[in-house]
Design a protein with these regions (language model features):
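Proteins enriched for Cys/Gly/acidic motifs involved in redox and nucleic-acid/cofactor modification
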Residues: 1-120, 158, 167
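Conserved SAM/AdoMet-binding glycine-rich loop
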Residues: 105-168
Length: 168
């Protein structure tokens, strides 16, 4: 059976949850337990998650994925992302720029800005996606920038003009 269904942000709690499962299994094996279903269901307060766990992936490739955003505030009827990943949130531009420059210093030639809905970048920090793009364009090195998963309604004329004339 299934003991837990975890959201994206809860993956960091897996070691503690395994200990809890093992402890419960140990107790259950020594005594007969009758728990009702409500005692077994755990629901995280995903709408309350404020922290952001940024990552970047490069390995031995020249392409580097840099996560700049997670979650979504659009509760579309067909989508479970807000329930699994929580509200839209992101790190500050200064933090992302450090990760990006580090990747370039390690040999990356392509930076792929990624997230659930990166056009929503800045909601949690009071910044704007266009400012992130400008910061990426100022990084040192010979590279290009790719944008992924940006909703069309969040692409402004300013963003389109900037990308069309960007150095990278």
């Amino acid at each position: 059976g299934v003991d837990y269904v975890l959201g994206q942000n809860e993956k960091y709690d897996i070691p503690q949850l395994i200990e809890e499962i093992e402890k419960h299994a140990s107790i259950a094996s020594t005594q007969e337990t009758h728990t009702n279903l409500q005692d077994k269901i755990r629901v995280a307060a995903i709408r309350e998650v404020d922290d952001f766990h940024g990552v970047h992936s490069a390995d031995d490739r020249t392409r580097c994925f840099i996560k700049v955003q997670d979650g979504c505030n659009y509760f579309c009827t067909y989508c479970t992302i807000p329930y699994a990943r929580g509200k839209s949130r992101n790190p500050k531009i200064a933090e992302v720029v450090i990760d990006a420059q580090t990747a370039l210093n390690q040999g990356a030639k392509e930076l792929i800005i990624t997230g659930v809905n990166i056009g929503d970048f800045g909601r949690s920090t009071g910044e704007q996606f266009i400012d992130l793009l400008r910061a990426f364009d100022q990084l040192d090195g010979d590279y290009r920038v790719r944008i992924s998963s940006c909703e069309p309604n969040l692409l402004t004329d300013e963003i389109i003009d900037f990308v069309a004339n960007s150095k990278h």
